[in-house]
C-alpha cells in the first residue's frame, strides 16, 4: 500500500476509529471484524432505518454482567431474554462452538447458524426473520460472555431484510 493511498483514506480511518466501540481493557478486536460491523452499520444508515436500535444492540453485546443486571432499558432487558431462545434452538451447537473457542482462543472462527424452516399450508417454506434474528442475538450474546469479540457473527449470519424486519419489530414495540 502506498503512502498516497493511505493519505486518501485517512479521514475515513479516523472516522472509524472515533466511531469504534470501546472494548474492555485487555481485549482487542480484529480490524476485519470491525470493518464488517462498520460496513453493516453504514449500510443500515444509508437505507434510512433507525441506527439507534443497532447502537443499543451493539452496546448490549459489549455489556458485562453487572451492567446487564443494573440496566433500566426495556430494550436491553428484552435482548437478555434472547439467550434462552438461542439455547433452546441451537442447544448442542452452542456448546460445540464454545468448546472450539476454548480450544483455539486466538483463531478466527467461522460460525454459520441454521434457520428453522416452517412449512406453510400451501406446501411452501418460510422463515420468520424476527425470530431468527432474536436467536442469533442470543447466540452472539452467549459467545460475547466468553470473550467480547464475536459481534461479527450477528452481521455475518443475518441478511439486511431480516435485520430490517427485526428493527421494525423493536421500533413498533418500544417507540
Swiss-Prot record:
GO biological process: symbiont-mediated suppression of host cytoplasmic pattern recognition receptor signaling pathway via inhibition of IRF3 activity
Record has Glycosyltransferase as a keyword: no
Up-regulation conditions: Expressed in the early phase of the viral replicative cycle.
Record-level GO cellular component terms: host cell nucleus
Keyword Cytoplasm included in the entry's annotation: no
Subcellular location: Host nucleus
Cystine residue pairs: none
UniProt-listed InterPro entries: Poxvirus_Bcl-2-like
Keywords, comma-separated and alphabetical: Early protein, Host nucleus, Host-virus interaction, Inhibition of host innate immune response by virus, Inhibition of host IRF3 by virus, Inhibition of host RLR pathway by virus, Viral immunoevasion
Function noted in UniProt: Plays a role in the inhibition of host innate immune response. Within the host nucleus, inhibits activation of interferon-beta promoter by inhibiting IRF3 activation.
Family: Belongs to the poxviridae OPG036 family.
The protein, known as: Protein OPG036
Species assigned in the record: Vaccinia virus (strain Western Reserve)
Gene that this polypeptide is encoded by: OPG036
Amino acid at each position: 500500500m502506498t503512502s498516497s493511498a493511505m493519505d486518501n483514506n485517512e479521514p475515513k480511518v479516523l472516522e472509524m476509529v472515533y466511531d469504534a466501540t470501546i472494548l474492555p481493557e485487555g481485549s482487542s478486536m480484529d480490524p476485519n471484524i470491525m470493518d464488517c460491523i462498520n460496513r453493516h452499520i453504514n449500510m443500515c444508515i444509508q437505507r434510512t432505518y433507525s441506527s439507534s436500535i443497532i447502537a443499543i444492540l451493539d452496546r448490549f453485546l459489549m455489556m458485562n454482567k453487572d451492567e446487564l443486571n443494573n440496566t433500566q432499558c426495556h430494550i436491553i432487558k428484552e435482548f437478555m431474554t434472547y439467550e434462552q431462545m438461542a439455547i433452546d434452538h441451537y442447544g448442542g451447537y452452542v456448546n460445540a462452538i464454545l468448546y472450539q473457542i476454548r480450544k483455539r482462543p486466538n483463531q478466527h472462527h467461522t460460525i454459520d447458524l441454521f434457520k428453522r424452516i416452517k412449512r406453510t399450508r400451501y406446501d411452501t417454506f418460510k422463515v420468520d426473520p424476527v425470530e431468527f434474528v432474536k436467536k442469533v442475538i442470543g447466540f452472539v450474546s452467549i459467545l460475547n460472555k466468553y470473550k467480547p469479540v464475536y459481534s461479527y457473527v450477528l452481521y455475518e449470519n443475518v441478511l439486511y431484510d431480516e435485520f430490517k424486519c427485526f428493527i421494525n419489530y423493536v421500533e413498533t414495540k418500544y417507540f
